[in-house]
Amino acid sequence: PEKNAVYREAALALALSASERALEASGVARDTVGAILFVSSTGLATPSLDSHLIQRLGLPATTIRLPIWGLGCAGGAAGLARAANLVTALGTPVLLVTAEICSATFMHGDRTKSNVIATALFADGAAALVLAPEGDGPEVIGSHSHLVENSEDVMGWTVTPEGLQVVFSRSIPQLVRTLAADVAAAAARSAGLEARDFANFVFHPGGAKVLSAYEETFSL
């Protein structure tokens, strides 16, 4: 309970700051925002923190709320895809907010490699952006999702009396080698492109072995 209380307070503060900056930078009138997505996986809150953000930010009471929990490292990318879907459906600006308090998941006394790696890789932070039907910024041209069968135990949390304990499988680098290229190609095709059309990639930095697997797979 103590860790989750820290999560709720810190995540809200970081999310509020990031949202204020995103709204200001976008120039979008707050009374035109049609939906807010709040993405997180390192703590729980009911009602979800987007309800607090709507009130603190002065967004309309009619703003659609979509909390997204449990997608972990993929949450931000998935949130961006769903936000783009909502912009298309609603025809209004949409606010996307992500916040994680990874320090609240550190397990004192847990000397497993997974706990040490997670502590080294992940930190506390928040990010926000405004998507709109029209504008001069970057455009979301498509999204793609792929579920690997029987992969539920590869990454995630184990709920313990002390809190959320990270789960990392040793198979992650091999999954990158066997699946990443085909999934990337399918994602490109879903947007009417080919993998060779991309000059740059953004990879999740899941440790040195994972980055090496990406280098091998994409000949970087």
Positions of PLM-derived features:
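Glycine-rich phosphate-binding loops at beta-strand->alpha-helix junctions
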Residues: I36-A45, F198-Y214
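Condensing-enzyme catalytic core mediating Claisen C-C bond formation in acyl metabolism
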Residues: P1-R8, H108-T178, D182-A186
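Short coil/turn connectors at secondary-structure junctions
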Residues: R30-G34, A61-I64, A89-V94, V116-I117, ...
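Conserved catalytic cysteine-centered active-site region
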Residues: E2-A5, E9, A13, S40-T92, ...
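Solvent-exposed alpha-helices and their adjacent loops that cap or buttress functional pockets
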Residues: A29, L59-P60, G72, L86-L90, ...
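Active-site glycine-rich loop that binds ribose-phosphate moieties when present
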Residues: I68, G75-R82, I101-G125
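Short beta-strand segments
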Residues: V39, W69, P93-E100, A123, ...
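Phosphate/pyrophosphate-binding loops at sites that engage ATP/ADP/AMP, CoA/4′-phosphopantetheine
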Residues: A18-V33, D182-A199
